[in-house]
Amino acid sequence: MCFVLILLMVAFLSNNPVLTRGDGPPPQPADQVYNEMQTVYLGNLARRDHGVPPLRWNAPMTEAARWFSWDSVENRPGGYCGHLDTLGRWPSERVPLFGYQGYSGAENCYCGYMLPQDAITGWMSSPGHRANLLDPNSREIGMGYYRQDTGGRGYLTQDFGHDPVYPPVVINYEALQTADPSVQLYVYDRETGGGFAGLGAAAEMMVANDVCFSGADWQPYAAEKSWTLPPGTGWRTVYVKTRDAVGRTTVASDAIYLGQNVPTNELGLHLASTNTQEVTLYGLDEGWPSVQLSQNWFVDDTFGTFGLLWGNGERVQDAVALGGTAFRLRPGGGESSAWVWTTEFFQETPFVAYFRLKVNNNTSSGEVARIFVKGGGTDYGPLSLKGTDFTSIDAYQDFPVAFTFHHNPADVFLIFQFWRSGDADVTLDGVYIFADSQPVQSPLTWPLPGGNYRGGGIWVRYTDGAGHFSPIEEADLTPAERLVVSPEALVFLAEVGKPSPPAQTLTIRQEGCQPFTWGVSDNAVWLETELVEGDTVQVRVDIAGMAIGSYQAMITIEAESWVLGSPVHIPVKLMVAEKIWRCYLPLTLRDHRP
């Protein structure tokens, strides 16, 4: 049998796909999921050998790759070798339809079924496929295997991409398992660019074995880091939070199985990177009527288009400014003005721009500054500021301007501009951008503008609708503290006059980041509960002197009053029988040989 390799190299940034994906393959068998993940790992070893960072396995791209492999077999009965699917879509069109919103389009295929090592060997032996596999611009990968149950026809698809808003973390080159808790992490830096929604390069990071970052401290960013997993056996997840010079954060994670033999029935796309269209916030202050949210949208004097328009002005070092620098406009020679602009931001969505300004003299009742926004040809402002509008000198203060960036082919710019118009120095730290106010509730699920949430930090600002607003804080994205107990019920079966049945256990799980205490109690003299480990309660029954019959009791696990899900009541049923009869079911082996 002949196997053909094909490739396509193109880059395309997803936005608002309109095509449909059609029918799709059946659920992926565990052995094929294993092959997909192993192919990703072996490809990363090839990248390592050529000095290229590893790729993070991605769920939406894998779904796209699986669909195309299935389509190329089941909907092409005469065989097929190419990149155009039966709905007329190329990879750059197909991959976004499955939810991936980064750059995509590069694709490797095998027009036949190959095992992981053979597939990587074949691709590395072909110059074009090798170039795709070793492309340093790719950060994520989708891998799709398909093979017919009858006939054996198969197809392999490998899709590549990178999303500017997502800096992946990869454990041990995306290996499925490790027997050694000491692992190597590759932590991607954030891509700069992306307009006013972009991030700066990572300055610091923290690493933890739990999503709460318990005990973690900020440390200088490094792409490669040694790390130790918690001991024992099972799946382990490592979380990495990075932040740039102005404090914009993002969180990424990866998982690996710690142990000798990975359970293939536990493999799946839940282990891959993904994205969502919304994010849920917890612990919001419901004492305010409204809240504004921002996915770290901030622009300052370090942005590439920031510049002095006219008059006296320069960048200055400022220890209290975000990022350590600001832009000062000075008196002399008339007014002075500076601006910053972009063509990349979310359109037709109401926002509020907060200009973070300070002056060195606030005594004037006349105008000392003006601020202005222009979005797609529509002017907002200018807002005139008097010296007395500043509550103190040399202290930054936020001034809001509501705006919408309209879609306008004749004017594609979003512009923030500020003037010095008086005798005081006017210094701009930067401009925060928040979505328009919405009612406060907690938890609150926020559909993000652009619909592509990938772990970025969320800023919160509360407002009262009368011009007052709170300081900015970072939202809590971890679920509120909750008490969870399993199993939900216990049943004991005993024989009168015989020893009591074996003990059973309850597992207590604390969700959320704030530790809490809990206790256990019961309401029956024949029931005994004992805390044997930090999260396990051992339950015994004592049937001494008990008559034949059915007995009911209740175990109560209760945490502090503010913990959700508490108390938890676990019903216990004890059945004492005169005699317990054990039966054994027959096992029949049938030989179907002719």
Labelled PLM ranges:
Residues 415-423:
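Short beta-strand-plus-loop segments that form exposed binding edges in beta-rich domains
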Residues 479-582, 591:
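Feature for long, exposed domains in two main contexts
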Residues 36, 285-288, 292-319, 583-588:
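Extracellular carbohydrate-recognition regions
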Residues 242, 418, 462, 557-559:
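Conserved structural position at the C-terminal beta-strand
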Residues 18-188, 197:
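Functional surface patches built around histidine and acidic residues
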Residues 166-295, 439-479:
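Low-complexity, disordered linker/stalk regions enriched in Pro/Thr/Ser/Gly
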Residues 315-336:
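Short carbohydrate-recognition loop motifs
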Residues 377-411:
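Extracellular carbohydrate recognition and processing domains
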